[in-house]
Amino acid sequence: KVRFTDSDSYMDLVIKTTDHTEPLGIDKKMPARFLLPLIDQKAASGFVNASLALDQARAVKDIQEQELMRKASHLNDMAMAEITHFFKEGVTETDLAEQLKKIYRDLGADGLSFEPLFAFGSNAASGHHWPDDTRLKPGDCILVDIGCTWEGYCSDMTRTFFYKNVTQHQQEVYHTVLKANEEAEKAVTPGIPLSSLDQIARGIITDKGYGSAFTHRLGHFIGLEDHEFGDVSSASADRAVPGNIFSIEPGVYLENDMGVRVEDLVLVTDHGHEILNHFSKELTVID
């Protein structure tokens, strides 16, 4: 390993520590302002795309990274608990998004993993609705997808609440999504095909008649970025390995009606898994 600080010259370091007769591996996201000087200096006998090797290495979090992501998720749990106190009739989605940013600052988080998502009622049917001036009213579902960073590492969690009252239809959709989330999480263990996790969750939702309303993959990998290389989907050819951290986030989105998503981050351990989020997933009606 070679360690350096941001005050060191990366160019001098590369020239000093590399074999100029061998190609130099670079990442696909390497900024041109770093790559072009390397080319000018002929710091290698050519360049190769090393993105896959780097992505695979980043997909396995070491002990320190795991602890940082536990802390980020703990802050996210606290923020979710705090923001529910602001669920009042007439509040807008953008009001809540701005309030959440203040909560994160007060908790000491570094910043946002992504712009927070608040969606009331039928707005939640889009799955990834951008907060607007829609006002909260009784009978609405409230889909909340939020994440903060701690020392550069991301958290991500989704919960869905109901305001003032909940119908039998809303309860059925919620419990269907919750079961899909919980059963997929229970199945996480080293060696399981990631496609199998998607199949478990999707099968539960399909059996209840909502298969066509589950419109995205089950999950994504996460770390220094909110969405990293690797996904939990029917198309994935990968298997879970210890150190992987990914989301499990089934959802049902019913146009002009409602949307429900329940999301946790899950760490693959040597003998099973650890759920990084601890905020309640019980069906919750906010009075």
Where are these regions (language model features)?
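Active-site neighborhoods and metal-handling regions in enzymes and metal-associated proteins
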Residues: 1-287
